[in-house]
Design a protein with these regions (language model features):
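C-terminal motif of bacterial Sec signal peptides marking the signal peptidase cleavage site
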Residues: 2-5
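A short, Trp-centered hydrophobic/proline-enriched beta-strand micro-motif
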Residues: 13-30
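Gly/Pro-enriched, hydrophobic low-complexity segments
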Residues: 44-49, 99-146
Length: 146
């Protein structure tokens, strides 16, 4: 009698070095739609509705740049509020490489649990490597990716 062993291979989605996804950002009673674009150097958030329609916030790990129509200004990131969406996404994506960040295979994707300056986060990624959601344990701030 011969027994063949078969191992189920779990395909883990790659952590995207760059992506471009629409999302809804919610903090308390306030929410806005945006496009979040990450490349190897920075994260940009383009606001798609509310009074800030068209505002682009870009964070490169040091500076936050605000661009609105012809207006553009750089602000040192450390002097800026940690709740800025571009800073939050940038820091979370960098934290995914941290050895303390936990990775769990879940139905339909992967759940990452880690920590940034903003707090402890839970990031859920779909099987196709797109992002699904980002939430923080001690905050009502969350991002639902489309």
């Amino acid at each position: 009698i011969s027994f063949s062993s078969c191992m189920a291979k779990i395909n883990t989605p790659e952590i995207p070095q760059s992506f471009n996804q629409n999302a809804v950002v919610t903090s308390g009673d306030f929410s806005f739609e945006c496009e979040i674009c990450k490349n190897e150097e920075s994260v940009s958030v383009t606001v798609k509705n509310t009074n800030a329609l068209g505002l682009v916030m870009t964070y490169d790990g040091e500076n936050v740049n605000f661009k609105y129509n012809d207006y553009s200004q750089n602000i040192l990131g450390e002097n800026f509020e940690k709740g800025n969406t571009a800073i939050i996404v940038y820091d979370v994506m960098n934290a995914l490489c941290d050895e303390n960040t936990k990775k769990h295979i879940i139905d339909g994707g992967v759940k990452y649990e880690g920590k940034t300056n903003f707090g402890e986060f839970i990031l859920v990624q779909n099987d196709n490597s797109t992002l699904k959601s980002l939430a923080f344990k001690n905050s009502d701030y969350k991002i639902a990716f489309k």
